[in-house]
Amino acid sequence: MGLLTLGTPLPWNETVPYVDYIKEHGIAQFIALYHRLKGREGDQLKWGDEIEYTIVKFDDDAKRVRVSLRAEELLHQLQAGEELNALLGNENCCLWRPEFASYMIEGTPGAPYGGLLACFNVVESNMISRRAEVTRLLENGESIMSISFPALGTPDFTSPPYEPRPDDINSFGCSLFFPDEVIYGGHPRFRNLVRNIRQRRGEKVAINVPIYKDINTPSPYQEDFTKAKDGGQAARAAKSDHIYMDHMGFGMGCCCLQVTFQAVNIDEARWLYDQLTPITPVLLALSAATPVFRSRLADVDSRWDVISASVDDRTAEERGLVPLKNNKFVLEKSRYDTTDCYIYPCSESYNDIPLQYDDKIYKQLIDGGIDDLLAQHIAHMFIRDPLQVFRERIEQDDTKSTEHFETVQSSNWMNMRFKPPPPDSEIGWRVEFRPSEVQLTDFENAAYCCFVVLLTRVMISFRITLILPISALTENMKRAQRRNAVLEQKLLFRKGIATCNSPPCARGAGCTLESDDVVEMTVNEIINGNGNDFPGLIPLMRQYLDSADVDVDSRCTVSQYLSFIQKRASGELQTLAAWMREFISEHPEYKHDSYVGDRIIYDMLKEMDRISKGEISCPKLLGDYCTKTDSRIPMAVRRAEEKLIVSTKKQS
């Protein structure tokens, strides 16, 4: 969702004079916060998920489905309920926040989950409650689905319908496909971001996704944009054999699943940030769920590169298309991409790609007492300009506010995010795991969340290290998006498990990883083991669970989640992307030309909706699992958690 500040957002031309000021004071704010809270210790493990949902409207007579632009109306009702509960002293089961599009809402648990394994047994139940809470407010024909809508940008894809205005200079996006009304209008952040990204870049964003070449797909596949009313931008930008898109909404209008963890202190947060980073491509491949864009089958299964291009505000100079004149750097990546550096001291030698940063900002951080590795990370983020400046919020007290820092931090969308505590808050140092595609059902989303959280427990308990050169991560994220990557791609990964008390980490920050310690592995080998040097992540998790204090129901639920992910990794169960491809290919109206028409999408989403509601089973996608998820943690377990909290506070 990002930072939602109240005020008057400045257009890009009015933002430019404040860019250096915002950066300088954003760094000053981080330095002040760091020194105030760097010694914070003893925070309990807390975590939570964020799921983005799409509201759709089925027209059963016309056999078509559209996105329903009622998010703002629904949010008013949902948030009114939150406020009422707060006044009455009642616990909120879940919280609701706006997202980029007028058809999207973001749901989170009402309070973070705690550190006990029993918390895993309430996750799925909470997700079920979220759907039910929204469903009660929906109109006839509407449904809430945790999917990325496959027909974004096609004619008449919204309810009610609106027309794009590519030749309107007052349009936020000037898109050929994506009307301004589809951007969430309840907060100025989203429309202002669309406008400022376009204006900073100097033209519309250009998204080109390789099209899936079916037997009847034209070769070359080329759309004709010569008559488009956008000054020739589409005709120049669209690539042959690619699906062309031209708006932030094609990326940020896709739904995702994210998990945030609170660490015990800043050192653990930095360490977890590094250790989870190599896992991000694995989860991207495992969660593949987005094979269709603009009603065309793509040759990728993920939204990752689409989002990256959809917010790419780099100028022609920064993209290396013309010599540098007004800008400082040629930037290799969009501001939405993979992380370029590790931040824990032991990981420094694995930062094997050049890191760009402004020397002045880096010096400000070093002079402010920030260590070299963290200073590089922050300075690298601050090569990006702030895209969102509010007129009333320019002057701030840098010792009390972090708004200028968050303005830049929250618009650097990486696969991992290191999150300092908010000012004057009980919240501690956190890391956010960001690559996962949202899944169709609550069971799947709960399984992926619990997998990642349990992995952090294994990492911390066994002190295992999965670090590999950061350049390998960049390559892995490219491979993980490809069609059927979970079965057909190999990812660079550690040959065997090392610990932070054994070589290479024990040798300190100057250690290096021998080249033959990194090998190519399938996702199945990473998850389930290769029978040789690498035991597999889930066997390690089961080993951890065998020695953990966990109640029977929670162990049963977690075991089913792990078994499910093992079968996804092995190919015994399909990813949603694979399931969708199969459904489309077998549909009688599909002409094997890569085009997925209205009726096909209607039938497919109707089937998906019934699966997500539990009205029909889908063994190919989900197997035959049934967890013991419950909305409440047993009282005995809750008391044990309270004792853990008290014990932790005494130790700190």
UniProtKB/Swiss-Prot annotation:
Keywords: ATP-binding, Glutathione biosynthesis, Ligase, Nucleotide-binding. GO terms for biological process: glutathione biosynthetic process. Its EC number is 6.3.2.2. Pathway: Sulfur metabolism; glutathione biosynthesis; glutathione from L-cysteine and L-glutamate: step 1/2. It is an enzyme of class 6 (ligase). GO terms for cellular component: glutamate-cysteine ligase complex. InterPro entries: GCS, Gln_synth/guanido_kin_cat_dom. GO terms for molecular function: ATP binding; glutamate-cysteine ligase activity. It catalyses: L-cysteine + L-glutamate + ATP = gamma-L-glutamyl-L-cysteine + ADP + phosphate + H(+). Belongs to the glutamate--cysteine ligase type 3 family. This is Glutamate--cysteine ligase. The lineage of its organism: Eukaryota, Metazoa, Ecdysozoa, Nematoda, Chromadorea.
